[in-house]
């Protein structure tokens, strides 16, 4: 059967048209409407996965950065008619510190879902059920078992596709409702489009691989606004989703909407009954609804960061939802103020947080409210702050505890007053013991972007959390802007309570993946109430050959320690606090077993690459007057040459020893290059004697007069040190003598030689007559010489290149010599025939046809 037909028959798809009724008017600037969803569909997750696998969706990058980017929320003062004042005064470096107690390590940690190069930021979210884990990102949706094994993965678009008209979904968030054992999932769809919608999905059971009800609502019938950044909460009667609206033209913040869904309706296969509140009098938005872990209060709370500096005070607002499931009532805001102030973002809301190895910063967004939870009648809230107010140099996580009236009971900031460590994108959970886990992103110039958390026990000193615990260190540098201007991270994370015990915690955080410029996500399961083997390292990022000191941090006194160090020397140890050397680059797991209990940390030690030590020299000879270029083999990094230069390549003109101190792009590993010795040799002194004029028909001249001996001659008519005047032709010619020293340095001298008919062809008084007939000849010639003295006669035939091609000696000592010579074996051409008496010679030109 066609798989698409099977899918359609199984899902029982149907639609419902929105119906709105006007509710009673509330405060000015707030309207409310009641209605039902525009579209509802029933789906099965595994069948969605089956259809997606069949259709093989495109992996072409979505690049949310183009249409859907981080929207800046303008500052606006809150209503000051009903103000709750923070009683704790101003922060100081002393009261901003942690309790000084170590946060517990995780009992388990593993990978969630990684970068598929289709979206920045990923918008990290996840939730935990009794048997499953779900991860929802801008890219994909994944279901895992509780040990981290992947059960199924689909794209975010595919999950929502049954609603129809879905081309671009974003900003997913997911929760597990422990009251009803259901999964709650919201997203936005179609940014900057007339089809802009809010989406809600609820599972039919605690098993997310099975049935779901999906709902879609068009957020603006006038098609002048679009929706961004939903926040979701729930209690025993409502599922509440808040989102921000922006103008279609210019994307200016206009208002925000709060959809209060009747939980009983959507859980019982209803049409999607909701009440919508639209607030236009506080465009600063991000009114974050509360997540309830018990039924200690019938109200739901909606928290907002109004301003980091409202007349010298930081300002929040609290609204409440009360009433019945079908007729919720939204209260006017209560204003909460503190004498502490903060900036709403880093400079111009751009890249802000540092990372190891590169100057590229990472965007930490703004101070919007991120997460609100309720437990035992206490409201906990977290958001980022940027400090100081004027010219922020760092980011931190500000946390609050309120009573249900908005009175501040605790608050503080997790931050580093020295400005070395940055924290952002917080999320919080509170268990039945009123212990708290706060997860967040951790940044520093000494680490890659990492995932971390801090724990608070209910009996810890007021206004304190325990020390930061980095449970997943980043593994590489990160920069990805898809052609935009911001190196996006976040936009959020999630921290939740385990529904099986209401005591242990889970947090999912983003970290820089092992592949350069990729993000990834990682889960940590934290149980503060059990014996947990744990350890720390004095350095998680080392260079080859460096050592790491490991310290046992287990929360119980163990008697037996068994360490295993992948990539380390030694590879194992039974010491409580061993020292291990890492000699090769890579990302290495460390395992500690204490009394049979195991703690394993993947990629815990990152051994970075040392820079390449080589220096390349160009082919220019080291001779005085030349310039030699030296280039470091390391293609990128920081360079510090022995000359003081800081470029990769330098030019050298003087003798000496040269080297470069190189820092690798990771910013951590440095070493000195190989040394290069350059010795510039002096150029030789070359001279050349003058030449006499020569007849064009004269025999080729062996050139001499160049010093030092052993050089070469060059010029017109010169070959192998012989000058042939007939080849050079009439005129004045330059002869150059070049000498190369043993060091390879050369110098030259030049003189001119004149070829002219004014000079005879070797006139000689001892030879009174010299004839060659016939000339031209077919090869057989008659040679006649008169006036020969009593000496040996040597006759030579020389070609145009000065080579002797025929020779013969005669010992007839008569005054007249006549000889017949056969030269027919020679190739046709022009030659010289020379009669040589030793102390005198005569030459004539000879043509052989």
Predicted regions and their residues:
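C-terminal PAP-associated
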Residues: 26-531
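Exposed aromatic-hydrophobic patches
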Residues: 579, 649-651, 818-824
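Exposed beta-strand and adjacent loop surfaces of beta-rich binding modules
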Residues: 138-140, 197, 255, 313, ...
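C-terminal outer-membrane/trafficking sorting elements
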Residues: 4, 9, 14, 21-25, ...
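Proline- and Ser/Thr-rich low-complexity, intrinsically disordered segments
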Residues: 531-557, 569-574, 583-772, 814
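Surface-exposed loop/edge segments in extracytoplasmic proteins
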Residues: 150-154, 210-213, 569-573, 648, ...
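Residue-level signal for well-ordered, solvent-exposed loop/turn and beta-edge residues enriched
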Residues: 149, 181-182, 407, 569, ...
């Amino acid at each position: 059967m066609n798989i698409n037909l099977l899918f359609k028959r199984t899902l029982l798809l149907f639609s419902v048209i929105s119906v709105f009724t006007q509710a009673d008017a509330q405060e000015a600037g707030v309207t409310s409407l009641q209605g039902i969803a525009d579209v509802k569909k029933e789906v099965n997750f595994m069948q969605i996965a089956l259809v997606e696998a069949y259709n093989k969706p495109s992996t072409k990058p979505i690049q949310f950065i183009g249409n859907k980017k981080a929207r800046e929320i303008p500052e606006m003062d809150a209503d000051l008619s009903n103000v709750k004042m923070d009683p704790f005064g101003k922060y100081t470096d002393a009261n901003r510190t942690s309790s000084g107690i170590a946060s517990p390590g995780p009992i388990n940690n593993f990978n969630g879902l990684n970068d598929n190069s289709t979206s920045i930021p990923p918008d990290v979210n996840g939730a935990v059920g009794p048997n499953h884990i779900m991860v929802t990102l801008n890219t994909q949706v994944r279901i895992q078992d509780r040990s981290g094994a992947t059960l199924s993965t689909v794209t975010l678009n595919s999950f929502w596709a049954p609603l129809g008209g879905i081309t671009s979904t974003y900003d997913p968030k997911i929760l597990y409702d422990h009251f009803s054992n259901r999964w709650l999932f919201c997203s936005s769809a179609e940014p900057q489009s007339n089809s802009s919608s809010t989406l809600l999905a609820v599972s039919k059971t605690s098993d997310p691989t099975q049935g779901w009800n999906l709902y879609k609502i068009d957020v603006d019938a006038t098609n002048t606004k679009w929706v961004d950044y939903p926040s979701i909460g729930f209690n025993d009667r409502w599922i509440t989703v808040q989102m921000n609206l922006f103008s279609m033209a210019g994307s200016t913040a206009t208002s925000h909407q709060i959809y209060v869904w009747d939980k009983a309706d959507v859980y019982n296969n209803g049409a999607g009954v909701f009440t919508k509140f639209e607030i236009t009098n506080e465009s600063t938005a991000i009114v974050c609804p509360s997540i309830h872990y018990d039924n200690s209060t019938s109200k739901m709370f909606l928290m907002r960061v109004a301003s980091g500096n409202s007349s010298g005070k930081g300002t929040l607002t609290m609204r409440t939802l009360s009433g019945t499931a079908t007729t919720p009532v939204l209260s006017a805001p209560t204003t909460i103020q503190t004498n502490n102030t903060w900036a709403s973002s880093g400079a111009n809301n751009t890249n802000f947080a540092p990372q190891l190895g590169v100057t590229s910063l990472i965007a930490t967004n703004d101070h919007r409210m991120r997460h609100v939870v309720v437990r035992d009648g206490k409201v906990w809230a977290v958001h980022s702050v940027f400090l100081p107010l004027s010219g922020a140099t760092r980011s931190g996580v500000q946390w609050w505890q309120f009573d249900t009236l908005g009175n501040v009971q605790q608050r503080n900031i997790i931050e580093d007053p020295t400005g070395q460590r940055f924290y952002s994108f917080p999320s919080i959970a509170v268990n039945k013991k009123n212990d708290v886990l706060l997860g967040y992103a951790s940044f520093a110039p000494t680490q890659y972007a990492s995932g971390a958390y801090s724990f608070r026990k209910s009996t810890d000193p007021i206004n304190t959390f325990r020390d930061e615990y980095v449970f997943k260190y980043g593994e590489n540098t990160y920069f990805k802007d898809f052609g935009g201007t911001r190196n996006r991270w976040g936009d959020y994370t999630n921290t939740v309570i385990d529904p099986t015990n209401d005591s242990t915690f889970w947090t999912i955080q983003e970290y820089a993946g092992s592949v350069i410029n990729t993000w990834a996500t990682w889960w940590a399961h934290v149980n503060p109430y059990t014996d947990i083997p744990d350890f720390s390292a004095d350095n998680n990022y080392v260079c080859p050959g460096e050592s790491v000191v490991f310290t046992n941090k287990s929360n119980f006194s163990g008697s037996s320690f068994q360490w295993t160090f992948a990539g380390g020397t030694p590879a194992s140890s039974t010491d409580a606090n061993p020292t291990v050397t890492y000699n090769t680059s890579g990302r290495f797991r460390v395992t500690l077993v204490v009394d049979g209990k195991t703690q394993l940390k993947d990629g815990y030690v990152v051994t970075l690459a040392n820079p390449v030590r080589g220096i390349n020299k160009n082919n220019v000879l080291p001779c005085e007057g030349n310039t030699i270029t030296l280039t470091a083999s390391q293609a990128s990094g920081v360079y510090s040459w022995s000359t003081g230069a800081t470029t990769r390549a330098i030019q050298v003109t003087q003798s000496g020893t040269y080297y470069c101190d190189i820092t690798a792009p990771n910013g951590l590993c440095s070493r000195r290059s190989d040394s290069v010795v350059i010795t510039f040799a002096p150029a030789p002194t070359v001279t050349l004697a003058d030449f006499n004029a020569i007849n064009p028909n004269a025999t080729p001249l062996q050139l001499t007069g160049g010093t030092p001996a052993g050089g070469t001659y060059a010029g017109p008519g010169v070959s192998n040190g012989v000058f042939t005047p007939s080849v050079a032709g009439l005129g004045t010619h330059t002869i150059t003598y070049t000498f190369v020293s043993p060091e390879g340095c050369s110098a030259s001298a030049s003189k001119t030689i004149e070829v002219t008919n004014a000079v005879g062809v070797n006139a000689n008084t001892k030879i009174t007559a010299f004839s060659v007939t016939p000339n031209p000849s077919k090869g057989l010639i008659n040679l006649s010489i008169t006036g020969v003295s009593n000496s040996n006669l040597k006759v030579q035939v020389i070609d145009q290149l000065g080579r002797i091609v025929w020779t013969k000696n005669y010992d007839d000592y008569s005054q007249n010599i006549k000889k017949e010579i056969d030269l027919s074996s020679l190739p046709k051409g022009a030659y010289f025939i020379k009669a040589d008496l030793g102390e005198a010679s005569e030459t004539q030109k000879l043509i052989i046809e």
